[in-house]
Swiss-Prot record:
GO terms for molecular function: ABC-type vitamin B12 transporter activity; catalytic activity. The keyword Oxidoreductase does not apply. This is Probable cobyric acid synthase. Keywords: Cobalamin biosynthesis, Glutamine amidotransferase. Catalyzes amidations at positions B, D, E, and G on adenosylcobyrinic A,C-diamide. NH(2) groups are provided by glutamine, and one molecule of ATP is hydrogenolyzed for each amidation. Belongs to the CobB/CobQ family. CobQ subfamily. GO terms for biological process: cobalamin biosynthetic process. It comes from Thermoplasma acidophilum (strain ATCC 25905 / DSM 1728 / JCM 9062 / NBRC 15155 / AMRC-C165). It holds the Pfam family GATase_3. Residues 242-424 form the GATase cobBQ-type domain. The keyword Chaperone does not apply.
Amino acid sequence: MIQVLGTSSGSGKTTIAMALSRIFFRSGYRVAPFKAVNMSLNSVIVEGEYEIARAQWLQAKAANTEPTRFMNPILLKPEGMGASQVIMLGKSLGKKTIPEYYEFIMNDGKRVIREAIDRISDDYDLIIAEGAGSPAEINLLDRDMANIYVSSIYNTPAILVGDIDRGGVFASIYGTLSLMPRPDLVRWIMINKMRGDASLLEPGLKKLENLTGKRVIGVVPYSENRLPGEDSFDYDHPRARGSKITIVRYPFMENYSDLDPLVYTSTGYNYVTAENASDLSDADLIVLPGSKNVFADLEYMRKNGIDKIIIENAGRAKILGICGGYQMLGQRITMGEISADGLGLLRAKTNYERTKTTRSVRYRVDNTLMSGTWEEGYEIHYGAVISLGGERMNETDKGPEGNVDANRLVFGTNIHGILANRSVFRFMTGRDIGEPEEYLRSEIDRFADVVKSSIDVADLIEYASSRE
């Protein structure tokens, strides 16, 4: 196992781990990605029913292996107010407060992480384990199971990645090594996101090596990529001037990965919030994405007049609701004794249930305006959407799914990844889309080539070979 640690969140651990997975796969290794604890609102269904972070799914793609629940044994999905939904081995344990989570991680969490590593080790030659945040959060060291706890299980070496683009990279690396437990497990240092001439760093790199006793394995240049993001900040971008596609960005928006087809086709889109709600009146396509708290996000839209603007434009613009967005477009949402009116644009209602639905689904778009071949998607939701009539949007292996309004301009579905469907993308945006799998392969290869040409891969392979 080789672990990829970072001096901070956003240092590039996820993409570096992805690139290394591809590099080692090309070198003939059976590689598995791993992240003990991931906090992310971007998740995907694997093995038909288990929920893991989309980042580990992508890393498994890079390793050319099937993703499993053991590659991300613990997933945290923030729900606000100091609580997160905890998912263990792909299944939800429900919402836990911070103290409840710490009790869980120190007991069941530690055991599950270790068992997951052992399970993967039986099937693969090499594990590329990604850390989380920084290993030097000194207020949390006894409860940090995502970083040094993982590498200390087998005393495996780590790469410490520093982000030079945000400045202060030498201090952040030296400070991390000074504060983290078991700095002896860090064997290599990597500088990431270098803009300009890397040779300018050489005096500093030599001094850093002398101060730390660690080898700088390489300097990776800054490289734009259009790969699926891990967190919401990966989808922050300058407003696309002139774009007629708007995404309603309510406070509890989740599954940003549904926007990936817009990203990798360079299709411009803009977010709409309370500050620029009037932009909806000029949109050709309005997307209501998933929501971690449908009731709160409905209230947000009502408080800021977003709901009225959407309703006013329902006969003019195309409107697509995905998962929580679909629920909000319906007539009513009920959770026990709590209920709220939806926007009333689709003939559907939602009843929330205790059991979470997590499943892969085969579907084909099948309605008056769109039709297509059978595709793979997935569902992640608590609410059961009940059709009250109207046309279905899709046919699935589980029966009819989704809803289309009478004017055939408002669409709702629980299927994540729906915009990757060629028929849907063409109808909604007026543009053609390529094969997503081919695009992913190409972009993974491109970034892996950048990393491979920038670091001493031979040193890493020599270590991996010595452990066989």
